[in-house]
Amino acid sequence: MKNKKRVFIASSLSCVLLLLSAANTEANSANKDSQDQTKKEHVDKAQQKEKRNVNDKDKNTPGPDDIGKNGKVTKRTVSEYDKETNILQNLQFDFIDDPTYDKNVLLVKKQGSIHSNLKFESHRNETNASWLKYPSEYHVDFQVQRNPKTEILDQLPKNKISTAKVDSTFSYSLGGKFDSTKGIGRTSSNSYSKSISYNQQNYDTIASGKNNNRHVHWSVVANDLKYGNEIKNRNDEFLFYRNTRLSTVENPELSFASKYRYPALVRSGFNPEFLTYISNEKSNEKTRFEVTYTRNQDILKNKPGIHYGQPILEQNKDGQRFIVVYEVDWKNKTVKVVEKYSDQNKPYKEG
C-alpha cells in the first residue's frame, strides 16, 4: 500500500513539474512577444513630442529676457505640420531690443522633425521587384524674400560637420556684436545666447557654399551607414542587402536587412536644429522668410527568389518637401504664416 502511495505521489509531482515547465515556457514566449512588439512600435520620441505640440502653434505671447541694463528679448514660436509629407516645421523667433544698436535683431531657430518615411515596396513589372526607399539626405533652406533691408549675418552650423552629435552656441552682445562657439552655454549677463544640439549619427552636415546675406542652406547627408555588424557606404548597391533566396515579391522586406537595425536617421527621421542671425533696418516694418524642409530618398532594388540578381541603386530618386512663408512684423514683434504648401517627387538638387 505504501509503495502505491509513493508511486502516486511521484506521479503527481511529475505532473506538477510538467505543468510548471509549460507555464514558464508560455510566460517566456509571451514576454518575448511583448518585447518584440515594443521594439517594433518604437518611434523617435522627440518626433512624437513635436507632433503633439503642433496644436500649440502661433505662440505669439511675449516672453522678454534681460540683456544687460536695457536690452530685452521677446520670443515667439510658430509650428506647422504637413500630413502629406509627414514633415513638421517648428520655428523660434527671438526679437532682440538693443538700445545701443541702430538695427532690429532677430534670431531664428529652425526645429521640428522630418520623418524618415522608410518604405518597402513590391514592383512586379520589374526584375528587381523588391524596393527599399530610405532617407539619404535631409535639407533645410532659409531665404529672405525680396527685401534688401533685411540681411542674414551669421548661421549655425557652419561648414561641414561629421561628428555624431552637433552642439554649438551663438552669443549676441549689446552693440550688435556676435560670436559662436562649440558646445552649449551662456557667456555673460551682458549677452544673449542661443544653442543648437542634434544627433546625426552616420550622416554629415554640410552648409551650402552658396550661402549669402539672403539665403542659407544645410544638407544632412548619409555617409557610412552602420546596421548590426555591417557598415556600408551610401554609394554601395549592397547597402542593407540580405540574401534573397527566401524572399518573395509579396514580402519585399525579406530582401533587406531588418529595419530595426538601421541607424536612427534611416529608421525614424531627423530632428533639425539650425540657427540664423538676422539684422533689419528700422525703416523696414515687415519681412517675409521662406523656409523649406526636404527629404531626399535613395531607392535600393533587389531581385527576390533563388535566382541571384545584381542589386540596383538609384540616388536622390524621390523626395518630398514642405514650404512655409512666414511674415515678421518688426514693430509689433509678431510672426504669422502667409503661405504653405507641399510637393511630392521633389528631391532637393544643388543649383
UniProtKB/Swiss-Prot annotation:
GO cellular component, one term: extracellular region
Gene3D superfamilies xref list: Leukocidin/porin MspA
Keyword set, alphabetical order: Signal
Disulphide bridges, residue numbers: none
Composition bias, Basic and acidic residues: 33-60
Alphabetical list of InterPro entries matching this protein: Bi-component_toxin_staph (IPR003963), Leukocidin/Hemolysin_toxin (IPR016183), Leukocidin/porin_MspA_sf (IPR036435)
Start and end residues of each stretch annotated as Disordered: 26-74
Gene Ontology terms describing biological process: cytolysis in another organism
Transmembrane segments: none
Recorded superkingdom: Bacteria
Pfam families: Leukocidin
Stretch forming the signal peptide: 1-32
Protein family according to the UniProt entry: Belongs to the aerolysin family.
Name of the protein: Uncharacterized leukocidin-like protein 2
Species the sequence originates in: Staphylococcus aureus (strain MRSA252)
